[in-house]
């Protein structure tokens, strides 16, 4: 009990650490891990599906000069959207079917040495997106979620944080029935 509370408290401090006015050196893996801990309740098994698997392919990363709280918000938006896509894809599937073909989110980090930058890829094996949705997904107030579930701000804000505040790039690869991958490239300067 107490250990769990301590773990969550520490995670919340890591997650919100970045409301700084200037960029600071930050361990990206700590940010992702704290985000996963905060979202743990959504990843756990429930009556309709087994636990969502998280696969971490963490490479060796240097600390990144950034606004940690803002980047953590990006990780939160992308992972929460992946969970939503997986849950939507579970519609009409039995617990046993999902167990055989489990819901999975794969997070890969690496350094691209060509142009010194850190890459963070968040991929789900959910329902994927149509061409029409892909074209609009970063638009302000665009959402595919039912009223009350999504605001249409998450990906628009994520792009602004990655590209506007950090000089990075956020891209998307998705195909219907094949899942979705968001890739974040952050300069190492």
Could you say what each language-model-derived stretch is?
Residues 1-189:
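Core catalytic ATP-binding domain of two-component histidine kinases
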């Amino acid at each position: 009990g107490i250990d769990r509370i301590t773990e969550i408290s520490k995670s919340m401090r890591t997650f919100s650490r970045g409301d700084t006015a200037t960029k600071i050196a930050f361990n990206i893996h700590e940010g992702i891990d704290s985000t996963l801990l905060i979202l743990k309740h959504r990843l756990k098994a429930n009556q309709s599906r087994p636990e969502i698997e998280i696969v971490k392919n963490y490479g060796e990363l240097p600390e990144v000069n950034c606004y940690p709280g803002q980047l953590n918000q990006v990780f939160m938006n992308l992972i929460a959207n992946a969970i939503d896509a997986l849950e939507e894809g579970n519609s009409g599937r039995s617990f046993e079917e999902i167990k055989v073909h489990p819901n999975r989110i794969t997070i890969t980090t690496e350094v691209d040495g060509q142009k010194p930058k850190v890459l963070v890829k968040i991929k789900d094996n959910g329902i994927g997106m149509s061409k029409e949705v892909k074209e609009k997904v970063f638009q302000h107030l665009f959402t595919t979620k039912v009223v009350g579930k999504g605001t249409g701000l998450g990906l628009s804000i994520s792009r602004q944080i990655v590209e506007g505040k950090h000089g990075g790039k956020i891209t998307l690869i998705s195909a219907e029935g094949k899942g979705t991958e968001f890739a974040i490239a952050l300069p190492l300067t």
